[in-house]
Every structure is written in structure tokens, then in C-alpha cells.
Design a protein with these regions (language model features):
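N-terminal low-complexity, Ser/Thr- and acidic-residue-enriched intrinsically disordered segments
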Residues: 2-118
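Surface cap/lid and interfacial helix-loop subdomains adjacent to catalytic sites
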Residues: 11, 26-30, 34, 38, ...
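Active-site signature of alpha/beta-hydrolase-fold catalytic machinery across serine-
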Residues: 19, 200-204
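Active-site catalytic motif of lipid deacylating hydrolases and related acyltransferases
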Residues: 29-51, 57, 97-184, 338-384
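Loop/turn elements at helix/coil->beta-strand transitions in domains of secreted/extracellular proteins
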Residues: 89-91, 134-138, 182-185, 212-216
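Structural recognition of the beta-strand scaffold that forms the well-ordered cores
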Residues: 92-95, 139-142, 187, 217-220, ...
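Active-site-proximal beta-strand/loop segments in catalytic clefts of secreted hydrolases
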Residues: 96-99, 142-146, 191-192, 220-224, ...
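Gly/Ala-rich beta-loop-alpha elbow adjacent to hydrolase catalytic centers
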Residues: 190-194, 198
Length: 384
């Protein structure tokens, strides 16, 4: 009995040492996600009949952003001269938001507007959709997004849940084209889970159709987008300059402190350097960096407990911080100056291990804003 007890104590010590190591190396969030997924995720199998009714996109309540309605997506960084063009811009943006549904016992979001998930969606409007309000009328659907736990399941389950969520995004895009767009050019923009769905929109509804010629560009940022999906596309290419049109842009941001760390599978990803707008763009120093903008509000990352709203407030966006970072693409990832000790450090480090997933938009806010305007102007110039 004493021998068994000693073995159990030894195993426990090893587990605690491993846990401590993960936290000390900055991977505490990954450990937390793993633990929450194992102990508190939704039950299997995924049953789509348990989801709420599909949203009707003729109902304004099922849009997180509309140009006819004032919202946090209208915020402009302090000191920037862009005026309010919502409803009058010659170009639209269709923005697909990332995962904000991080807790709960269902695989897909309930569409409850009085929830922490909805507050996370508003965070995305304020800090990810807003860079496009200088060029475009902003449209962003709410949808029955996949729970964060779906990303930590076997591929079959993950694909089922994400595929279910995609059907809402597809219907929203079709409604947008048929009822809002009125033949105008548009930008497709997204982040993370939204990028997964947007890549399918490109493949299934845009490429090879007249929509590809109306699409100024696709800013499908964050997460994984492999180059090979563009091999079979007919009319959508990868952007390789600041003014290329009818093409896609993608990056996945990491600290340059981990640039020599081997990351399996990442080498096959698309990487656009947003300081040069070159595909696989090499090291670009700080001088072209147009400005990071500190995120407004709080993105709630709790993975358990109630999904009730907490009353998150959104202050006006602050002034851009210029020339703050350098950037380079290497082996499919975008590496930037380490953000430890900057206003972005805590947020950027939330995923651990040098992963700056949460900074894909904020640190390049002004670069995205100005490039979107530049591409729109190029499109309008070519269209006469």
C-alpha cells in the first residue's frame, strides 16, 4: 500500500510540475482550454436539432453591424480625419466575426443578445470591423457560431459544428448580395472562425463568378489558411502588392521571439506582410508601420460559468501608436516585435507561447484602414 501511495504521489508531482511548466512558459491559456474542454465542454455527439432556429437575415436584430444603425463598429481612432460615410460609401464590407462563444453546454450559440457572447461580438465590431468604416458600409451578420470547444475535438466533430455555423454565414452573405449590395463592389473581411467560413464563401460562391470581379479584396485574417486552396481557384488569387484587386490577404501573428520554434503545418499557410502588403514579405522595419490601436472594451475569455452579459463598456478608440513594430513572414507565419511590456502585451500573450492571435487586427489597425481605402480607390479608378 505504501508503495502504491508513493507512486501516486510521484505521478501527482510530475503532473503538477508539468502544469507549472506550462504556466511559466506562457501556455497557461492552452492548458486552461484543454482542462475546460476535457471537464466542461458540451456533450457528444453533436446534434444540430438541438440548436436554436436559424436566424432570418431580413430581421435587423440578426446583424451585429448595419450601416443604417449606429454602433461600436463606427468608432474611429482619435485624431483620424475619416468622416462618417456609413450608408453613403460606394463600397460595402461583409465582415464575418470570429469565435466569441467560449462557455456554455451547447455546441452552437443561442443567439441570445443579453449574453457575454454578444458582448464579445460587439468587441469584434469595435476592434476588428471598425478599420473598414473608412472605406465601406459595414455589414456583419450574427450567426450560430461554433463553440470554442469544437476546435479541440476530433476532425469529424469539428467539421460538423463549423459546417453547421457556416450555413448561417452563407445565407447571410446571399441575403447581403440580394438585398443590400445593389451591385456595389465589396470587401470580404474576417478573423479566425470567421476566416474559416469566409474561405468557403470564396471557394463556393465568389470564385469563378461575377462576384469575384466585384470583390475588391478579401482580408481573411487569423488562424489557418493554406496556400493550396487557391491552386484550384479560377478568378481569386493571392494579393502581392498594396493595390492588387480580386485577391486574398491573410496573416497569423506571432512574437518574433519564437521565430525559430518549429510549428508543424504552419509552413503551408498564406502569409501577407501588412507593412509591405507583399506575399511572403520579408523583414520590414518599423518606419512603414501606420499604427496600432489599443482595443476598446474587454474580450471575455472565461471558459465556464454563466453566459450572462456582464455590462462591458466600450470607450472611444485612442490615438494610433505609429512605428511600433517590425514584421516579417517566415515559413507561413507573421512574426512581429515582441509585445511584452507594451499596451498590447497582456492581450497578445493570452494564448501563450508567443501566439498573438488576439492582436491580428489591433496592432495593424491603421495599416488595414489605409490599405482598404487604397484598394477601394484603385478599384474605383479602374472602373472609371
Amino acid at each position: 500500500m505504501k508503495i502504491i501511495f508513493k507512486i501516486l504521489i510521484g505521478v501527482l508531482a510530475l503532473v503538477l510540475a508539468a502544469i507549472g511548466g506550462l504556466y511559466l512558459t506562457g501556455n497557461g491559456m492552452l492548458l486552461t482550454i484543454f482542462w475546460a474542454t476535457t471537464m466542461g465542454g458540451p456533450s457528444l455527439p453533436f446534434d444540430e436539432t438541438e440548436a436554436v432556429e436559424p436566424p432570418s437575415y431580413s430581421d435587423p436584430d440578426n446583424w451585429a453591424a448595419l450601416p443604417s444603425r449606429v454602433g461600436v463598429e463606427d468608432m474611429i481612432p482619435k485624431g483620424i480625419g475619416d468622416g462618417d460615410i456609413q450608408g453613403s460609401a460606394p463600397v460595402d464590407v461583409f465582415f464575418v466575426h470570429p469565435t466569441g462563444f467560449l462557455r456554455g453546454k451547447s455546441w452552437t450559440y443561442s443567439m441570445d443578445k443579453n449574453s457575454a457572447t454578444e458582448e464579445n461580438t460587439q468587441w469584434m465590431m469595435a476592434n476588428q470591423a471598425s478599420p473598414f468604416n473608412g472605406c465601406c458600409n459595414v455589414y456583419a451578420p450574427r450567426y450560430r457560431q461554433a463553440n470554442i470547444f469544437s476546435y479541440f475535438q476530433e476532425e469529424e466533430v469539428r467539421d460538423q459544428v463549423l459546417g453547421f455555423a457556416y450555413q448561417d454565414v452563407r445565407r447571410a452573405f446571399e441575403y447581403f448580395i440580394a438585398n443590400f449590395s445593389e451591385g456595389k463592389p465589396f470587401i470580404l473581411a474576417s478573423h479566425s472562425q470567421g476566416t474559416h467560413h469566409s474561405s468557403r464563401l470564396l471557394q463556393e460562391l465568389i470564385d469563378g463568378t461575377e462576384l469575384s470581379q466585384r470583390m475588391v479584396a478579401a482580408y481573411i485574417i487569423g488562424g489557418t489558411i493554406q496556400r493550396k486552396i487557391f491552386d484550384d481557384m479560377k478568378t481569386v488569387t493571392l494579393c502581392d502588392s498594396p493595390t492588387d484587386l480580386h485577391c486574398a490577404i491573410h496573416w497569423d501573428t506571432w512574437s518574433e521571439d519564437v521565430i525559430d520554434t518549429e510549428m508543424p503545418g504552419v509552413a503551408e499557410n498564406v502569409c501577407t506582410n501588412p507593412l509591405s502588403w507583399r506575399l511572403n514579405g520579408g523583414l520590414t522595419e518599423k518606419s512603414p508601420h501606420l499604427g496600432a490601436v489599443v482595443a476598446s472594451g474587454v474580450f471575455q475569455v472565461e471558459l465556464s460559468g454563466s453566459d450572462e452579459a456582464t455590462g462591458v463598456a466600450f470607450d472611444p478608440l485612442g490615438s494610433p501608436i505609429k512605428n511600433m513594430l517590425r514584421a516579417q513572414c517566415k515559413d507561413g507565419a507573421l512574426y512581429i516585435s515582441d509585445q511584452t511590456g507594451t499596451p498590447f502585451g497582456e492581450q497578445g500573450g493570452s494564448f501563450g507561447g508567443g501566439n498573438y492571435h488576439g492582436l491580428d487586427y489591433p496592432v495593424f489597425h491603421m495599416d488595414i484602414r489605409e490599405n482598404a481605402k487604397e484598394r477601394v480607390q484603385e478599384y474605383l479608378n479602374r472602373s472609371g
